[in-house]
Amino acid sequence: MITITIVYFTNKIQHVKKIKLNIGTPVHEALKILQINIKKNNKIGIYGELVSLNHILNNKDRLEIYRPLKINPRELRKQKINRKLK
């Protein structure tokens, strides 16, 4: 058995869950077990590195589900600069 941590957000709430899985469990199985439905535009990572849904999880992995950005960081900087100039 392996133990992993899954981190994801719903609205403005961060969820952190630890679960035990069988050795050789892929990401998509872990999500199915936790009944987490991800959208097509969500990315999945382990410790900040993107992985596929078929990636095999290892003991003590931190599985992260990333939300899509609401605004491009470059556009956000432009908006902040424009506000300061006014």
Swiss-Prot record:
<protein>
    <recommendedName>
        <fullName>UPF0125 protein bbp_234</fullName>
    </recommendedName>
</protein>
<comment type="similarity">
    <text>Belongs to the UPF0125 (RnfH) family.</text>
</comment>
<dbReference type="InterPro" id="IPR016155">
    <property type="entry name" value="Mopterin_synth/thiamin_S_b"/>
</dbReference>
<dbReference type="InterPro" id="IPR005346">
    <property type="entry name" value="RnfH"/>
</dbReference>
<dbReference type="Pfam" id="PF03658">
    <property type="entry name" value="Ub-RnfH"/>
</dbReference>
<dbReference type="InterPro" id="IPR037021">
    <property type="entry name" value="RnfH_sf"/>
</dbReference>
